[in-house]
Amino acid sequence: VAFRDKVQAIIVFLDWAQTLNVAVIPYGGGSSVCGGVEAAVGDGFAGTISLDLERLNRVLEVDPVSRAARIQAGALGPELEAQLKPHQLTLRHFPQSFEFSTLGGWIVTRAGGHYATLHTHIDDFVEATRLVTPSGVMQTRRLPGSGAGPAPDRLVLGSEGTLGVLTEAWVRLQNPPRFRASASVTFSDYFTAAQCVRVLAQSGLNPSNCRLLDPLETVFSGVGNGSHAVLVLAFESADHPLQAWMARALELVSEYGGRYD
C-alpha cells in the first residue's frame, strides 16, 4: 500500500509504476461491494500496489459567490461536510456509505444518494476534475455549459479508476436547507405504490427524497412489519416553506391508495 499527499508525488509514483510494469489501484474509502479495489489484475503485471488517497482530504478553495468548492478526492463525506460548514455551504450528497466513502469514489462510480431525487447523482455537482494518468495530467476548467464537442469530465465520471487517479474536483454546493416537509406513506400493494412514484416523479414537484421500500425491505429497515410497502417522501429548501408542495404530493398519494398520518 502506498500513501501520497501531493499531486506531484502521485505523478512520480505513476511514472515509477509504469516503468516497472506495476498495476496501481486507487483506493478511496473501500466501501464498494463490486471488488474494484481488489488486486485482480491478471498475470500481465510484475506486481500490484494499492494507492491510498486518505491523505488527500482537504477542501482547498471555496467560491461562495458561485457556491462551489475545490475538494481533494480522498475526503470522506463527513470530512468535507465539516470543512464546508464554516462557509455555511453543503454538498448535500448522501450515498448509503456516506461516512466511509470519498468524493473521488463518488465521482468515479457516478454515485447516487438519499437526496438524489431532486439533485439526481454526483454528475450534477461536478464542475471540473483533475485526473493524473500514466501519460500526464488531464485537468478540466470551470466553464459555462457548452455544446462544443464531448465533455472531458464525462470521461472521468464513472471511470472506476481505469484511466488514472482522480486527485481533486470542483463541485457545486448548496445552502443548507432551512425548510423541510416529510411524510411516511404506506401502500397495501407494491405495484400501485410504484405507479404513484412514477406520477410523483413526472409531476414537476421535485421532492428531495422519494424512496419506495418493498414490504420485505421495510422489515430490514425497521419501518414496517412486512405487510405494506412504505414510501419515504420529503421536500427541502433553503429559501421557502414547502407546505404547498407536500400538500399536492399527498393528494397524488391519496389517489393511489396511500395512507399517511
List the predicted regions and their residue ranges:
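C-terminal substrate-recognition/cap domain of FAD-linked oxidoreductases
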Residues: V1, N175, A181-D261
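Glycine-rich N-terminal segment of FAD-binding domains in flavoprotein oxidoreductases
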Residues: V1-E54
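FAD-binding subdomain of flavoenzyme oxidoreductases
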Residues: N57-R211
